[in-house]
Amino acid sequence: MKRLLLLTLMIIYVVPFAGAQSTPAVVNPAIDMQGYLRISAEAAKYRESRRLTEAEFIQMSREDGTVILDARSQEKYNELHIKDAINLSFPDITVESLKSTFPDKNARILIYCNNNFVGAEKPFPTKAPTASLNLSTYIALYSYGYRDVYELGPLLSINTTKLELISTPQSVK
């Protein structure tokens, strides 16, 4: 009787774990979490010296060969964006779209995101700090080989910023 009870308990506790160990990992060669974590750590170190004050951002934006990238959705970009910024929505960042938009990987690119502005929640909805679009955009550009990337650092009020913010007129349908 004791043996039967012991055997039953072993089956109850051991069998579920045995099955879990034999389940094969789901592999997708187009998704590389370990590579992403590695490149993110590398980009994070590189990024620290490339965060700009508002004045530095304005000064750099006026220099020849510098472009401003707005990676928010086209809708949010149209509502309000930094004057002269180019819109390339984050989900649309690919090898092809980057080649088309920034053919020179050595071009200086300035980035900003929702979490750089307060006072206009509709065009600049706040994201969780760890989900800031600046972080994703910086890592993506770094992953594709763009190294001359700078990020607007501070949180600015749209009412007091020295950056010129404009709307894109919508075409009439």
Predicted regions and their residues:
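Short Gly/charged-rich anion-binding patches and loops
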Residues: 56, 72, 136
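A short, well-structured juxtamembrane/interface segment
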Residues: 46-60
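Rhodanese-like catalytic fold shared by cysteine-dependent sulfurtransferases
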Residues: 18-48, 78-82, 86-88, 93-173
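Short hydrophobic beta-strand that contains or immediately precedes a catalytic carboxylate
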Residues: 67-72, 85-88
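Bacterial N-terminal signal peptides
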Residues: 7-16
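Short coil/turn segments at beta-strand junctions that form active-site/ligand-binding loops
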Residues: 64-69, 105-108
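Short, solvent-exposed loop/turn elements at domain surfaces
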Residues: 59, 76-79
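Positively charged n-region of N-terminal signal peptides that target proteins for export
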Residues: 1-4
